């Protein structure tokens, strides 16, 4: 069985196994990739040498004195040497050198940057260490001792590379090498498009040793001292800050947290003092400042203040004459008397803090002082393995050049000078960001806080916004800059995107142990040209980038950017935790702040606002901290109501903005709710002012869990230290999703408008500010509350997915908008005269009340959510803590509906809601309201009067019973998940997509309505959550779980359908019953597969496998294929949705099995040899008794008394589904069953036989035969004699493009012949009329004018072409993948297109696809979907994995394959290669070409991607896309390669035939020398795959002898061989 044939590597064949250690999540990964021999370095090239040569080549390349270390400023970490570092690099340094200390004789060295850098260079060795897959160190790169050469390039500009000889070297050293070689490497990032190319971040040694240079950063209010200037702080210059209490003239001012004057502490020797205090320090809370207007002061612009703490800064004054205040230098701290600094030789004299280097100093000597990006080429197994291409410097002025003008020019606030004394505090307020409180960002440090140099015209008494300095005197200005400390806080987190390298900043600071305030202020970008020979460096402040995230839906807030006003007077900074690709989007995460240490007391804040008008658009005076708002109100303004935005007519620019962030607001809020918000302002300010209050429509884009700074539910106070000091607590996580394409393409220079203001229109502002023009629906960046892997575009809000969610009818299985909570099937229960189930499990009538409920997303709101969250509960100011929800409205269902039990009399039909009632077609009871109005039922409308709750019919409900949920599981509370669940009911809410997926996990909490009366009321004791408690009686398992969202099944996974039976040969449709279920194969085929994971273990990763074809996009969701037709033209007013079963043949596509919870039997999906996705259904195990009963067609009692464990607990099983086990019951008799567990048993097979009570309207709507008949009638085809089109039998109808509307299609009588009564009256489909267009199927050709002339979508039976993959879409209802596509808008298809795509509503713009070599296929498909591998045999399907591909009909799908090259069960890794069949004849491949290995070869398809999804924050996890990292699900390997080849098949492969051929010749002997972890598996692969059977022609051209010790160097075509150079010895 094991073949041992040995074959040597041929000349024209070489193999590289890139040994790269995988991430912590995936373990070790073996990756194989094969390319042609060529002389230039392409993206796809790897080299490979035998592992036993590695030791020889790298002998003595390791310096044993160097040990790993970690640079704390970035996310780079030197992981343990166990193969876990995914970049195969680590930072190492010599720790034998002693730390830098400053004695009395070395003070000039210590404080002179140049001498300091020179002294540090001689002290310690820093290097990079390369590792192989097994964690073995290969060699060190010590740049200080390296004499590198730049690589040579060919005529196309590509790096010259030979897999064995290595890089061609030019003999020239890189430019400025001598200036940068002594810098410290602190981070490495691998280019995703080139496995040999790395970006190395180098920083000066002063950065690494900053804290040891005795230059601690001390700021005002950092800590309290006793006022004496004699205490020491060990080796650290702790710049002292005097206690504000020491100023007797300022007795009212306190630093919260300072116990007394004598409570100050000093840090221990050698210990650094952090803001907020280290151990032993007293934490300094925010400074309180009180302002109060005199009661008799007139509102004349010059107000008199009764109390004005703002008039005095928290520092001591030496003199006070008039309005001129002189600050003394000793207010800023004292240096140690034993260590004077340059410029001040007087021991003990005060020394204002200055940065280590100013911005201009860094700029003038970039090679020495800036951070440098070094482009390193490194191929571990080549002879010339290392080359350094170029060095680029991150100029701080590239960032400051794009600062807003308000940051570069000191000025007063735009709103004028209100209080002359306040000028003392607002010293040179540069964008509300002054050097006194934030000296790190000012070149002069604390020295510029001296208001002698304000440069302001103090004689200007007009109080206008002409507060700029009189002369452009740079000496007097203090613009926000980027000096040394703040600059290096901005270095870190290297991220490649295309030819752009983005530097987002670090999560710490060079002064981290002393101070945590300096953070990243923006992002640097190094953009290389196509060949990498030149680069440009630019930077954008986060203030600019994040201001692009605005609310587009509300007119009142259009001009308010995120976290800024129109003049960019706020300076957001960010501690970047990491940047990574999630899917195709770039997610930036960290903490963001605009923190300051001064706050304004809550009670006096409103006085300050209304009387002094000192507030600029929501940011109070000195309020530099970021006022983030949560779903529960302002994070730091809990006193403010969350309901309105007030804009006074008299002060339109000055009033604060208040945000109503109730998630349930719609575009048209209810007027009485608006009135409720306005009333407090009316009472206080009068109606004239209140008329300018507008509701804010929550857009769902940001400020959910991201900004939950203060937890109002637990009454946890907002931490002043947290807000002000940029703490790293996880609840401050900030996540922004950036569009990397636009980010990489932004211009180098930002253009601002007049006076730095925004344009009047937000889109004009975009063009003016960024000089780019994104389309209306694609803001170039947006927030996401969760790091979602499921996204349909740059802006999830308003995306196509959201449109689908608006359309999809959410399905309940009985009891208006909810479940029959007792789990009683009315077929097995007696019927009352009203048609209601009595709850007794016996059958007398055989009817069923399980009627699906169709509605729009807004159903399920039992209470008035708008009034609930926006009413009186939100208007409390200063009273008791605001409750989250009104007690009267706790009957909310979390996005689904509620249960309305029987009326007390038992005769009413209150609880049995027919489809006509749910859709508003008739009236029920005594109320006739709008369609689908939840309040139309009397007992559902609960009002509150005092403490009593009353239903509309007057029956009082005990408050405690009605509202108290006593049986909730311990991990759920009534409010814990309500924000998420409530947003599920909203239109245009980004979280709805997440809940769409979370429904599959069953993780959304379910709250049960307590309404009703008497014994029929749902009791608290009935709220059973534990399956084990009720496993004997499933009728009591009343709360749905595991995929059921409050009784609403996910429409993408299930269908509501009617099984139909022709009874008695009458040809009439006499019996029908609705059901919900999945499709399974109806034929007796063996759907055998290995269960990889339980079908219930859904994760967002299961939603994916995106396939784009023309104007159609599809993705797989479980066992279903969801297709959006006309995906790229959503503006046309229609949207198609098609659900196709993946596991049934076309002929049996409509076969359904009905069950309340069909997913319980789903066991996973797989791919057969034809590439079809098939599913495994464990129907025998779960519903065997019910299936047996139905198949026997007689009254039978279930034989299985012991139910299996809950489906989620079922372990891995292998099941064979045989259709013969589910023979439908065709008897016309009544079936009686005492089914005691309807939740775990099959209700009915496809064909059921009895139903005496049914809503005919719903039946007619859902009957597929009748729908098809109506469709044929609508399109003028013969509906009586013409046979059914094959396509109508096999596909779900698609909402298409024809004129008309949905209601007109389905109106009129049914065509079944047996329907009667209301069945002929049509159905009002107003709830689903949001999507216009005909309900059209895939119809055959017709000459009717309403359809195109070619609609023949029947499967092609002539060519024998199998339907392959999940993306097999018919070409006629979607544009073929040709060169031109009209009307493209920016969607994920932008990855395929040249240019911006269609951006206007008028006129199509022809857009061409990119050439195949430019298309990054893997960036289109980022979601693993299906399990492919049999864990027993390791390899499946002749060692070739069928692809999920969507290819034109002209291409034989058998001509593309994915070959398994290696598999390792120990490390759970896989090596794959994509291959394309090239026949011998030079013809374009098509279906007529026979795929015969004897007539052609499978060649590697070299269309590697340029960019790939990243999976970890580690900068080394920048995998090339052609290196396929695996997502491991222990204990089974799970991988999917989702590739669309429709655009790539057209490559003239025959032209590159010789260049693409790759053969394999591996002997068992050579495999045996691999590491123990992979060797045996490789051997098994070779034996099973026959890799050793290399193509004969390749063997013939091989000149190597078998068993050659080393493969020879392949010759260069058309060029003489270069001399073979011996491997260089490490320096």
UniProtKB/Swiss-Prot annotation:
Q: Which InterPro entries match?
A: Adhesin_P1 (IPR022400), Adhesin_P1_C (IPR004940), P1_N (IPR022116)
Q: Explain the purpose of this protein.
A: The protein is the major adhesin mediating the attachment of this mycoplasma to respiratory epithelium.
Q: Where in the cell is it found?
A: Cell membrane; Cell projection, Attachment organelle; Cell surface
Topology in membrane: Single-pass type I membrane protein
Task: State what protein this is by name.
Answer: Adhesin P1
Q: Polar residues: which segments have biased composition?
A: 224-234, 903-933, 939-953, 1274-1297
Q: What is its main location?
A: membrane
Q: Where is this region: Cytadherence epitope?
A: 1403-1415
| Record's GO cellular component terms | attachment organelle; cell projection; cell surface; membrane; plasma membrane
Organism of derivation: Mycoplasma pneumoniae (strain ATCC 29342 / M129 / Subtype 1) (Mycoplasmoides pneumoniae)
Biological process (GO) annotations held by this record are:
adhesion of symbiont to microvasculature
User: Where does the signal sequence lie?
Assistant: 1-59
Give the organism's phylogenetic lineage: Bacteria, Bacillati, Mycoplasmatota, Mycoplasmoidales, Mycoplasmoidaceae
Transmembrane annotation, as ranges: 1527-1547
Xref: NCBIfam families: termin_org_P1 (TIGR03839)
From the UniProt entry, list the residue stretches annotated as the region Disordered. 219-238, 252-355, 898-953, 1274-1362, 1589-1627
Compositionally biased tracts (Gly residues): 1307-1320
**Skewed-composition ranges (Low complexity):** 261-276, 1341-1352
Compositionally biased intervals (Pro residues): 1604-1627
The similarity comment for this entry is: Belongs to the adhesin P1 family.
């Amino acid at each position: 069985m094991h073949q041992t044939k040995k074959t040597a590597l041929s000349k024209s064949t070489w193999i590289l196994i890139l040994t790269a250690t995988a991430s912590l999540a995936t373990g070790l990964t073996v990756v194989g990739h094969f390319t042609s021999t060529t002389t230039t370095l392409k993206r796809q090239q790897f080299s490979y040498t035998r592992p036993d040569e590695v030791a020889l080549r790298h002998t003595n390349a390791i310096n044993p004195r160097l040990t790993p270390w970690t640079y704390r400023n970035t996310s780079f970490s030197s992981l343990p040497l166990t193969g876990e570092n995914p970049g195969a690099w680590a930072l190492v340094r010599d720790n034998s050198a002693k730390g830098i200390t400053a004695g009395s004789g070395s003070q000039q060295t210590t404080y002179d940057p140049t001498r300091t850098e020179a002294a540090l260079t001689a002290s310690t060795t820093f290097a990079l260490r390369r590792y192989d897959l097994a964690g073995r160190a290969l060699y060190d790169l010590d740049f200080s001792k390296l004499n590198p050469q730049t690589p040579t390039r060919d005529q196309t500009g590509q790096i010259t590379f030979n897999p064995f000889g290595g890089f061609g070297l030019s003999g020239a050293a890189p430019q400025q090498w001598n200036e940068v070689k002594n810098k410290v490497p602190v981070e490495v990032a691998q280019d995703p498009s080139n496995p040999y190319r790395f970006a190395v971040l180098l920083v000066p040694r002063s950065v690494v040793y900053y804290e040891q240079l005795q230059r601690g950063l001390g700021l005002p209010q950092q800590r309290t001292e006793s006022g004496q200037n004699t205490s020491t702080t060990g080796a650290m210059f702790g710049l002292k800050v005097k206690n504000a209490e020491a100023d007797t003239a300022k007795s009212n001012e306190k630093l919260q947290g300072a116990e007394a004057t004598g409570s100050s502490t000093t840090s221990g020797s050698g210990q650094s003092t952090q803001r907020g205090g280290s151990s032993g320090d007293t934490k300094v809370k925010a400074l309180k400042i009180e302002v109060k207007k005199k009661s008799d002061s007139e509102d004349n612009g010059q107000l008199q203040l009764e109390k004005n703490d703002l008039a005095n800064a928290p520092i001591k004054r030496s003199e006070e004459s008039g309005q001129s205040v002189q600050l003394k230098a000793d207010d800023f701290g004292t240096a140690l008397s034993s260590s004077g600094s340059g410029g001040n030789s007087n021991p003990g004299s005060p020394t204002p803090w200055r940065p280590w280097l100013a911005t201009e100093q860094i700029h003038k000597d970039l090679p020495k002082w800036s951070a440098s990006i070094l482009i390193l080429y490194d191929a571990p197994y080549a002879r010339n393995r290392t080359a350094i291409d170029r060095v680029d410097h991150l100029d701080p002025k590239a960032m400051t050049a794009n600062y807003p003008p308000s940051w570069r020019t000191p000025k007063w606030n735009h709103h004028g000078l209100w209080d002359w004394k306040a000028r003392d505090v607002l010293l040179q307020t540069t964008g509300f960001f002054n050097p006194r409180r934030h000296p790190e960002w000012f070149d002069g440090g604390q020295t510029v806080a001296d208001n002698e140099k304000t440069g302001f015209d103090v004689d200007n008494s007009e109080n206008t916004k002409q507060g700029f300095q009189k002369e452009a005197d740079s000496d007097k200005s203090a613009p926000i800059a980027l000096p040394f400390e703040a600059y290096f806080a901005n270095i870190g987190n290297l991220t490649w995107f295309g030819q752009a390298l983005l530097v987002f900043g670090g999560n710490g600071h060079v002064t981290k142990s002393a101070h945590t305030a300096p953070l990243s202020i923006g992002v640097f970008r190094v953009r290389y040209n196509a060949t990498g020979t030149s680069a440009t460096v630019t930077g954008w402040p986060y203030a600019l980038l994040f201001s692009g995230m605005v609310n587009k839906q509300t007119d009142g807030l259009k001009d308010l950017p995120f976290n800024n006003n129109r003049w960019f007077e706020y300076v957001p900074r960010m501690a970047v935790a990491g940047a990574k690709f999630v899917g195709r989007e770039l997610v930036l995460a960290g903490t963001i702040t605009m923190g300051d240490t001064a706050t304004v007391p809550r009670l006096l804040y409103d006085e300050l606002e209304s009387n002094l008008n000192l507030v600029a658009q929501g940011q109070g005076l000195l309020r530099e901290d970021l006022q983030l708002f949560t779903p529960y109100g302002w994070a730091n303004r809990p006193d403010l109501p969350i309901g309105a935005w007030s804009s006074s007519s008299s002060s339109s620019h000055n009033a604060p903005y208040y945000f109503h962030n109730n998630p349930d607001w719609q575009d048209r809020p209810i007027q009485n709710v608006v009135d409720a918000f306005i009333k407090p302002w009316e009472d206080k300010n009068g109606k004239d002012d209140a008329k300018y209050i507008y509701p804010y429509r929550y857009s769902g884009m940001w400020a959910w869990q991201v900004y939950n700074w203060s937890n109002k539910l637990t009454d946890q106070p907002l931490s002043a230290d947290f807000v002000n000091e940029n703490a790293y607590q996880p609840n401050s996580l900030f996540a922004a999703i950036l569009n990397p394409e636009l980010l990489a393409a932004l211009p180098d220079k930002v253009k601002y408008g007049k006076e730095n203001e925004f344009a009047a229109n937000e889109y004009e502002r975009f063009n003016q500010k960024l000089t780019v023009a994104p389309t209306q629906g694609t803001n170039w960046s947006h927030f996401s509350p969760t790091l979602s892997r499921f996204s349909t575009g740059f802006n999830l809000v308003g995306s196509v997915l959201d449109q689908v969610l608006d359309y999809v009818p959410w399905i309940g299985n009985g009891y208006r908008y909810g479940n029959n909570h007792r789990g009683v099937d009315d077929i097995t229960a007696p019927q009352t005269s009203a048609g209601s189930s009595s709850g007794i499990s016996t059958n007398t009538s055989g009817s069923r009340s399980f009627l699906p409920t169709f509605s729009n997303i807004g159903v399920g709101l039992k209470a008035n959510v708008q009034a609930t969250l926006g009413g009186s509960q939100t208007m409390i100011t200063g009273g008791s803590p605001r409750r989250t929800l009104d007690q009267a409205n706790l009957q909310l269902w979390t996005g689904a509906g509620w249960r309305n039990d029987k009326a007390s009399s038992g005769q009413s039909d209150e609880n049995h809601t027919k489809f006509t009632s749910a859709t508003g077609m008739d009236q029920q009871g005594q109320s006739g309201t709008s369609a689908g109005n939840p309040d139309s039922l009397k007992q559902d409308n609960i009002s509150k009067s005092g403490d009593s709750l009353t239903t509309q019919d007057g029956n009082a409900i005990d408050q405690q019973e009605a509202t108290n949920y006593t049986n909730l599981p311990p991990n759920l509370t009534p409010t814990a998940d309500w924000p998420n669940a409530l947003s599920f009911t909203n239109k245009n809410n980004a979280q709805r997509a997440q809940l769409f997926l979370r429904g599959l996990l069953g993780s959304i909490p379910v709250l049960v309505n307590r309404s009703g009366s008497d014994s029929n009321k749902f009791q608290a004791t009935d709220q059973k959550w534990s399956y084990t408690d009720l496993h004997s009686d499933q009728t009591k398992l009343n709360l749905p779980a595991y995929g059921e969202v409050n009784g609403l099944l996910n429409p993408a996974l299930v269908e509501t359908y009617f099984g139909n039976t022709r009874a008695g040969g009458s040809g009439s449709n006499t019996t029908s019953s609705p059901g919900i279920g999945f499709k399974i194969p109806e034929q007796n085929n063996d759907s055998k597969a290995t269960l990889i994971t339980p079908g219930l273990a859904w994760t967002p990763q299961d939603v994916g496998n995106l396939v784009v074809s023309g104007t159609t996009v599809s993705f797989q969701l479980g066992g279903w294929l969801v297709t959006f037709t006309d995906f790229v033209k959503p503006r046309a007013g229609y949207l198609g949705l098609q659900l196709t079963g993946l596991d049934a043949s076309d002929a049996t596509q409509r076969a359904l099995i009905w069950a309340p919870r069909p997913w319980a039997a789903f066991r996973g999906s797989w791919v057969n040899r034809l590439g079809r996705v098939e599913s495994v259904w464990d129907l025998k195990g779960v519903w065997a008794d019910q299936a047996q009963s139905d198949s026997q067609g007689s009254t039978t009692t279930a034989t299985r008394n012991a139910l299996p464990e809950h489906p989620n607990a079922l372990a891995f099983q292998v099941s064979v589904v045989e259709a013969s086990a589910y023979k439908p019951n065709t008897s016309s008799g009544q079936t009686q069953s005492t089914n005691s567990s309807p939740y775990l048993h099959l209700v009915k097979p496809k064909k059921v036989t009895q139903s005496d009570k049914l809503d005919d309207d719903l039946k007619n709507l859902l009957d597929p035969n009748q729908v098809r008949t109506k469709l044929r009638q609508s399109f003028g085809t013969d509906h009586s004699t013409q046979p059914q089109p094959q396509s109508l039998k096999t596909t779900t109808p698609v909402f298409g493009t024809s004129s008309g509307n949905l209601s007109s299609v389905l109106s009129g009588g049914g065509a079944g012949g047996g329907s009667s009564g209301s069945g002929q009256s049509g159905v009002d489909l107003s709830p689903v009329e949001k999507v216009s267009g005909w309900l059209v199927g895939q119809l055959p050709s017709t000459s009717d004018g309403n359809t195109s002339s070619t609609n023949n979508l029947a499967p092609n039976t002539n060519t024998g072409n199998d339907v392959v993959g999940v993306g097999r879409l018919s070409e006629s209802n979607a544009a073929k993948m040709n060169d031109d596509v009209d009307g493209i808008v920016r969607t994920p298809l932008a990855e395929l297109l040249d240019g911006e795509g269609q951006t206007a509503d008028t006129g199509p713009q022809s857009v061409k696809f990119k050439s195949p070599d430019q298309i990054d296929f893997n960036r289109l498909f980022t979601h693993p979907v299906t399990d492919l591998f049999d864990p027993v045999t390791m390899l499946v399907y002749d060692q070739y994995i069928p692809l999920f591909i969507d290819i034109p009909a002209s291409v034989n799908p058998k001509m593309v394959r994915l070959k398994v090259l290696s598999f390792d069960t120990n490390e759970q890794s896989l090596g794959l290669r994509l291959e394309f069949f090239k026949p011998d004849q030079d013809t374009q491949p098509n279906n007529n070409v026979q795929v015969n290995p004897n007539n052609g070869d499978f060649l590697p398809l070299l269309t590697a991607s340029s960019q790939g999804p990243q999976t970890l924050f580690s900068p080394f996890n920048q995998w090339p896309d052609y290196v396929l990292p695996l997502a491991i699900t222990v204990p089974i390997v799970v991988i999917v390669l989702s590739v669309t080849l429709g655009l790539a098949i057209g490559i003239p492969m025959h032209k590159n035939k010789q260049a693409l051929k790759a053969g394999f010749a591996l002997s068992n002997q050579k495999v045996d020398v691999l590491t123990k972890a992979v060797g045996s598996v490789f051997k098994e692969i070779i034996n099973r795959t026959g890799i050793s059977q290399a193509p004969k022609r390749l063997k013939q051209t091989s000149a190597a002898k078998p068993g050659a010790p080393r493969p020879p160097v392949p010759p260069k075509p058309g060029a003489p061989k270069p001399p073979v150079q011996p491997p260089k010895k490490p320096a």
